[in-house]
Regions:
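Loop/turn elements at helix/coil->beta-strand transitions in domains of secreted/extracellular proteins
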Residues: 222, 254-259, 298-299, 316-322, ...
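Von Willebrand factor
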Residues: 23-38, 53-55, 68, 77, 287-319, 362-365, ...
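Sec-exported extracytoplasmic/periplasmic mature domains
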Residues: 232, 247-255, 290-294, 308-316, ...
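C-terminal motif of bacterial Sec signal peptides marking the signal peptidase cleavage site
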Residues: 19-21
Length: 569
C-alpha cells in the first residue's frame, strides 16, 4: 500500500509542465499563441489517425490474431465480480494467476484508504547527511521490453492493464532514446538533469549508457538455436505469431550462420541441427516455419534443456551463440518451477550462450518468461503482431542478437543534500553485491531514470559522479567509463533525451496508477487519473514531434475512452 501511495504522490502535472517550460526557454519561445503557456509547435493537438507502429483497431494483423476472443473485452465483464487478490503490487503476478484471465474481473475497491497526504508530507531530507551517498543501479537487459507491448496488446483488446504487469524500465527500453555512439568496446555515459519545480524541490535525473554501433558488415557469425513451443496451448494466434518470428529471423540470417531447431510439447524433436543457411530467407528455414503444428501438453523445461544441449554441442569459435525460446509460457508438464526451468539459461551463460525469450499468445504467462530471462540475463520481448515480429527480429536484429558489453552496473554518487525519491530502473542499493549487472546491446542504450529531491543546503557547485562498470565480451576485461559533473552543469546542459524519458515514465506510471486507483479509490478517481495522464502525454506528443509519442497518445486516448465507457452510470 505504501509503495502504491508513494507512486501516486510522486507523479504530478509539474513533470511535463517543467519539461515544456525548459524546452520553451531553450528555444526562446516562452508562451503559446493561445496564451496557455505551452510553446506553439505548429501541430494539430489531436492524435494522428494512424502510424507506422500503431494499431488499426478495425483489422489489426488479422492473420496473426485469428482467435482474439471477444469475451475478454469491457462489455462482457461482470461489474459485480471481484478479483482474488488484494492490492496489485509488483509481486501480484505470483499470487497463483497463471494467465491474464485471472484479471478479467473488475478490481475490488478497498474502502479503507490511508490519507495520501501522509505520504506526500514524508520528509525525504531527514536524516541530515554530511557525506555523499553512493548508489548502485541496474537496469534489466537493454532489450527486455515485453511490458509495453503487453500493455498495448491489452489496450487494443479493450482490457484493463494490471499494474503488476507494468515494468517501467522496460518501457524505457522499448521506446527509442538514443545518444552518440562510443567506439567499439566502450560505452557513452550521459547524465542529464531537469528541475521540475514545485515546493517539493524535485529534479529528474536520467543516465543513458549507450552501446556502440553495429552494422551488417561488422556483426559476428551467428549460431542460432530455436526452442519452439508446439503444445496445444499454442494453437491459433500464438502459433501464427511463432511462425512470424521464425520468418523474421530467416530474413535477417546470412551465409555463414547456422540454425538448430528444437520443437517440443510433451515430447521433443530436433528439427534442424547446425544447419548452414544459404542466405536471407533460406527455403529450409521458411519451410520449417510453415510446417509447425500444435498439440500435446507443455514441457517447457525439457524443451529448453535440449535446446541448450544443442547450442553447447554446436558452438563454433568466433561466433555469437543465441538460444531463442518462443512460447506462451504455460508450462504444465515436467518441471514447472520458474527457478528450475531458468537454471538452463543461468548455467549456459558460462558457456557464453545467451538467451532471448519471446512471448506469444492470449494466455501468456508473463511471470515465467520474465523469471527465466532475468536469471539467464537475456532479452525478453512479447510479440502481439507479425509487424512486431519484424520490428524485433529484422529492424532490431543486431540489438536483439549481439552483445556490446556485459555486466553493466552504474555507480551514482550524489551530494548529501540531493536525495533519491523514486527510481525507475530494476535494482538499486547502497551495496553493490545486491545489484545484479545486466548486458547492453549494440545500437541501444540502457536508461536509468529517477526523481530526486533537492534538500536545503544543496549548492550549484555540488559534485555528481556517474561511473558505468562493464565487461568486454571479447577479452572479458573489466572496464569503466566515468563522468564527473555538478548540479549546475547538469541543469544547464542538453536534455532532449530526458524530455522523452520523462514522458515515457509518466505514461508507464500512469497506467499503474489507473489500475491501483480502481482498487483503492474507485471508478471516478481512476478516470480522473487517466485523463490527467492523457493530457500530459498529449502535451509531450505536441512538443516532441516524435512518432513514438504519437503512438503512446493513441493508446492513452483509447484506454481512457474505454475506461469511461466501461464505468458509465
Amino acid at each position: 500500500m505504501g509503495r502504491t501511495l508513494a507512486r501516486l504522490a510522486c507523479l504530478g502535472v509539474a513533470v511535463l509542465a517543467a519539461v515544456v517550460a525548459c524546452m520553451s526557454a531553450e528555444s526562446g519561445d516562452s508562451t503559446a499563441a493561445d496564451g496557455s503557456g505551452w510553446p506553439d509547435v505548429g501541430r494539430d493537438s489531436s492524435a494522428d489517425a494512424s502510424s507506422e507502429t500503431g494499431w488499426d483497431r478495425s483489422g489489426a494483423d488479422a492473420d496473426a490474431d485469428a482467435d482474439a476472443d471477444a469475451d475478454s473485452h469491457w462489455e462482457s465483464w461482470d461489474p459485480d465480480a471481484r478479483s482474488d487478490s488484494s492490492a496489485p503490487d509488483d509481486g501480484a503476478a505470483d499470487s497463483g494467476a497463471d494467465t491474464w484471465e485471472a484479471y478479467e474481473a473488475s478490481p475490488e475497491v478497498v474502502e479503507d484508504v490511508p490519507d495520501v497526504g501522509d505520504t506526500v508530507l514524508m520528509d525525504v531530507c531527514a536524516p541530515i547527511r554530511t557525506e555523499p551517498q553512493v548508489l548502485y543501479l541496474s537496469a534489466d537487459d537493454s532489450n527486455s521490453q515485453a511490458s509495453p507491448v503487453i500493455a498495448r496488446w491489452l489496450i487494443h483488446r479493450g482490457d484493463l492493464v494490471p499494474s503488476s504487469l507494468i515494468r517501467t524500465y522496460e518501457f524505457l527500453n522499448y521506446y527509442d532514446i538514443h545518444y552518440d555512439y562510443p567506439e567499439r568496446g566502450r560505452v557513452n555515459v550521459v547524465p542529464q538533469m531537469l528541475d521540475l519545480g514545485g515546493v517539493e524541490g524535485r529534479v529528474a535525473l536520467q543516465i543513458g549508457v549507450q552501446g556502440h554501433e553495429q552494422t551488417e558488415e561488422t556483426r559476428r557469425r551467428l549460431s542460432l538455436t530455436l526452442s519452439l513451443d508446439t503444445s496445444g496451448s499454442m494453437g491459433g494466434s500464438p502459433l501464427e505469431l511463432e511462425k512470424a518470428v521464425v520468418r523474421a529471423l530467416a530474413s535477417s540470417l546470412r551465409t555463414g550462420d547456422t540454425v538448430s531447431v528444437v520443437t517440443w510439447n510433451d515430447t521433443r524433436t530436433i528439427a534442424l541441427d547446425s544447419y548452414p543457411v544459404t542466405g536471407r530467407d533460406d527455403a529450409t528455414v521458411l519451410a520449417l516455419a510453415d510446417s509447425l503444428v500444435s498439440g500435446g501438453t507443455t514441457n517447457l523445461d525439457a524443451g529448453l534443456e535440449l535446446a541448450y544441449e544443442r547450442a553447447v554441442a554446436n558452438r563454433r569459435p568466433g561466433t555469437l551463440n543465441r538460444v531463442v525460446l518462443i512460447s506462451d509460457g504455460q508450462a504444465n508438464t515436467g518441471v514447472t518451477s520458474d527457478e528450475l526451468i531458468a537454471r538452463h539459461a543461468e548455467d549456459a551463460e558460462g558457456e557464453e550462450i545467451y538467451l532471448v525469450g519471446v512471448g506469444t499468445g492470449n494466455g501468456y504467462d508473463d511471470r515465467l518468461m520474465d523469471t527465466v530471462t532475468d536469471l539467464g540475463k537475456g532479452a525478453y520481448v512479447f510479440i502481439d503482431t507479425s509487424a512486431e515480429a519484424r520490428r524485433q527480429f529484422v529492424d532490431h536484429f543486431y540489438a536483439n542478437m549481439e552483445i556490446a558489453v556485459m555486466d553493466v552496473r552504474v555507480e551514482l554518487t550524489l551530494p548529501p543534500q540531493l536525495r533519491m525519491q523514486e527510481f525507475h530502473g530494476e535494482e538499486i542499493s547502497t551495496d553493490p553485491t545486491e545489484v545484479d549487472p545486466q548486458h547492453l546491446a549494440p545500437n541501444d542504450a540502457m536508461i536509468f531514470h529517477q526523481y530526486l529531491t533537492r534538500c536545503p543546503g544543496l549548492a550549484d557547485a555540488d559534485p555528481i559522479r556517474v561511473v558505468a562498470e562493464y565487461t568486454d565480451p571479447q577479452t572479458h576485461a573489466r572496464r569503466s567509463d566515468a563522468v564527473d559533473t555538478s548540479v549546475a552543469l547538469l541543469l544547464e546542459g542538453s536534455r532532449m533525451q530526458l524530455y522523452k524519458g520523462n514522458a515515457i515514465v509518466v505514461y508507464a506510471e500512469g497506467l499503474k496508477n489507473v489500475y491501483d486507483l480502481l482498487v483503492y479509490a474507485g471508478d471516478a478517481a481512476a478516470q480522473a487519473e487517466c485523463d490527467r495522464v492523457l493530457g500530459e502525454v498529449r502535451t509531450a506528443a505536441d512538443v516532441l514531434e516524435d512518432q513514438e509519442m504519437d503512438d503512446i497518445l493513441l493508446l492513452m486516448t483509447s484506454y481512457c475512452a474505454d475506461l469511461g465507457s466501461r464505468y458509465e452510470p
